Amino acid sequence: MSKHELKDKKRKSVDGEDVSKSKKVKKDKKDKKDKKAKDGNDKVKDKKDKNKKDKSKTDKNLKEVQETEAHTGSETAPVGDSTAAAGYVESKELASVPQADVDTFFSENEVAVEDPESLGFRPLLSFSHLNLHSAIQKEISKFPKPTPIQAVSWPYLLAGKDVIGVAETGSGKTFAFGVPAINSLMSEKSTPRGVKCLVISPTRELASQIYDNLVQLTDKVGLNCCCVYGGVQKDSQREQLKKAQVVVATPGRLLDLIEEGSAKLAGVQYLVLDEADRMLEKGFEEDIKRIIKETKSDVRQTLMFTATWPKEVRELASTFMRAPVKVSIGNRDELSANKRITQVVEVIDPFKKEKRLLELLKQYQSGAKKNDKVLIFALYKKEASRVERNLKYNGYNVAAIHGDLSQQQRTQALSEFKAGTANLLLATDVAARGLDIPNVKTVINLTFPLTVEDYVHRIGRTGRAGATGVAHTLFTEQEKHLAGALVNVLNGAGQPVPEELMKFGTHTKRKEHNAYGAFYKNVDLTKKAKKITFD
């Protein structure tokens, strides 16, 4: 139909001519067909004009992909290839893995998956089973194989599902959420603008550690990553936020930046709550909810990683996650200690603890062990300061992290300990959760923590990433109300229970009600030990 005919038809319709419904439908279909044909001709012409310009660029990209495939042994794609950078398709190599091998993997690693949509993804037992952006594939291929939490969670995360990961610290959780998050950002044809990936962490030290790991990936793909936390000036953080696509933050400082308008989260596509149980313990629940409200649920994929799975964490997850897949590594519903850690509990007079500490340091740092890293836990910062001075007086090169130190001093202390400049680190519980300090051979609990949960998290600083370790605990009569709970943990990990500890009784304080007080249960040592469930 010509343009003049269309104009005439339109003019007649305006003048009041009655056009039947069936004719109008035919007309619309014909117009769409004509337009589609015209657009197709235009595209063919544009494509011919562009072919010569793009030929050299295409050849170059093809060469890069072929080189990467030769290096990693898997198919990869350049930036902007949505096949490799977004979504998940099981590889033929993974599909050919015998089911017996998959069953063995699940059994040996105590893996449990709650899959509400029954997707049934198989774990990625090798990096060659992945199809990621080439730079990311190359970076992670430096490691021997995916950790259990990575192997099981990656398929669901790459498929865009909300995921809850329940696993001990030191299990590779940062790359478990970092690799799919950054890979998904690379599916965009141009560099994304604004904050797209947000990781919330309970402490400054843990936030810095997560940042150090993620920047290994973001630097390789041309994205900007920044870390915001309290205790330092905001000016540099404001500037970094303007350019960052990936942000790691503590709740308090992030809320400050949101309220002043420096942090805008409406574009967040990937939200991660790391150490969620720890954040709730520290009273960040309302802060977390306020931060989440700044994001848009219809575009947000949400991840939660936690070492334990108490009622409070379950309730938080139910409020903002959509049909999440829950991946548990080990028996994380109940409190249990790493079985690779040798636990030694010594009942002692409280006034003899610091003298005994010096004896233990000679024991654990003698001969071939003189350079071994030892992490010492005190309960309060005043105690930590006093013990630090005493150790330095006795000639020990000790670093310390506790509340009386500035953020710069704490960061410096951690750096010295990681580098081996100082082989003793004295800490309060600020360092008990989440921090990945490699090669800690021994943990000494100079003063027992306020809860057995904190005890388990403290000793978890050793025996990480498949290694073994020793945890030596000085226990006094002042902590006798925790004796029963400690006995349960020792029995659950197959560790010896000293007779002196049994003298304090074997009741376990389960819960306390404002009106009815505490409820207790007795430990029957003739039966197989049951682990404690905190609800």
Curated annotation (Swiss-Prot):
User: Record's InterPro entries?
Assistant: DEAD/DEAH_box_helicase_dom, Helicase_ATP-bd, Helicase_C-like, P-loop_NTPase, RNA-helicase_DEAD-box_CS, RNA_helicase_DEAD_Q_motif
Q: Which molecular function terms from Gene Ontology are attached?
A: ATP binding; ATP hydrolysis activity; mRNA binding; RNA helicase activity
Q: Which Pfam families match?
A: DEAD, Helicase_C
GO annotations of cellular component type: nucleolus; preribosome, large subunit precursor
Asked if the record carries the keyword ATP-binding, the reply is yes
**Record-listed ATP binding positions:** A167, E168, T169, G170, S171, G172, K173, T174
Q: From the UniProt entry, list the residue stretches annotated as the region Disordered.
A: 1-82
User: What is this protein's function?
Assistant: ATP-dependent RNA helicase required for 60S ribosomal subunit synthesis. Involved in efficient pre-rRNA processing, predominantly at site A3, which is necessary for the normal formation of 25S and 5.8S rRNAs.
The protein's name is ATP-dependent RNA helicase DBP3
**Whose protein is this, by species?**
Eremothecium gossypii (strain ATCC 10895 / CBS 109.51 / FGSC 9923 / NRRL Y-1056)
Q: Encoded by which gene?
A: DBP3
